[in-house]
Amino acid sequence: MLPSISINNTSAAYPESINENNNDEINGLVQEFKNLFNGKEGISTCIKHLLELIKNAIRVNDDPYRSNINNPSVTYIDIGSNDTDHITIGIDNQEPIELPANYKDKELVRTIINDNIVEKTHDINNKEMIFSALKEIYDGDPGFIFDKISHKLRHTVTEFDESGKSEPTDLFTWYGKDKKGDSLAIVIKNKNGNDYLSLGYYDQDDYHIQRGIRINGDSLTQYCSENARSASAWFESSKAIMAESFATGSDHQVVNELNGERLREPNEVFKRLGRAIRYNFQVDDAKFRRDNVKEIISTLFANKVDVDHPENKYKDFKNLEDKVEKRLQNRQTKYQNEINQLSALGVNFDDI
């Protein structure tokens, strides 16, 4: 299913530069869009090309609402899908428009979003460090973010203050619900000169971090090359980049503060941090499964539910409970090992 994306659009109208039936030209735009993520173009330019790609990938020839996508007065566009036959487009506060789109078209748009936004930031060096941790968490499969947790993606490029002046705000926000309904978010922001990336669980107002691991941004800045910094005006305008990776355990809440001199091997730190987060997620998942098995056993037998061959059923569920318990202990051991290794590298963990 195509994830929902929302875009603040403050640019002028887009030219009708692509023949909708010409796959070569569409592929050319796809490649051009990919090339923008090399640290030399601003995110606003990338978003304009993304809109152009989506507009043409839908391939609707006679829909009168299509012109609204190119209207320079439009400031907000929401693109999503709830079924296999349509893509919905909401413009400002208007009722959403439904446009027919086949599965292949929608997969094209989804692929572009997945490959070129989730895994890209302005600064190539910084991107490689930050997202190596995210890839480690999801076993190298960035599609896990979309397919296993949520299908919601949101982009916000600019916001306006009371005087009408625009300024960068959330450059990229993906948010959604995990399988147990907790709010999870990945955020890249630029606020008051501080840029940061975060991955973690948020409380109900979707703003405050509920639990996780924090890394001081000054520790990362020094590892970004001068070439990468000079290539991006957005990066130069900021004094530091913060990267926050948050553990996903239901009972785990730690803050990791790094001073610059401690982060001698940033890639090793991020790799171990990624593994620790993944193992902690698996610990939480194993606890969930264990509790579920215990609940089944309690329901079937403590309440004397009438089942065929209750002794065999009880034995089966007890065996399953033992397996889940062993998996839980195994993941807890692996998680603790990664935390110990991180501590040996100079990472300080303080429970809060």
From Swiss-Prot:
Keywords: Secreted. Coiled coil: none annotated. The lineage of its organism: Bacteria, Pseudomonadati, Pseudomonadota, Gammaproteobacteria, Enterobacterales. It is found in: Secreted. Induction: Member of the type 3 secretion system (T3SS) regulon. Expressed at low levels and only when the T3SS is active, in a MxiE-dependent manner. Expression requires MxiE, IgpC and a MxiE box. It comes from the Bacteria. Belongs to the IcaT/YfdF family. This is Invasion chromosome antigen T. May contribute to pathogenesis, although some of its characteristics suggest it is a fossil gene. GO terms for cellular component: extracellular region.
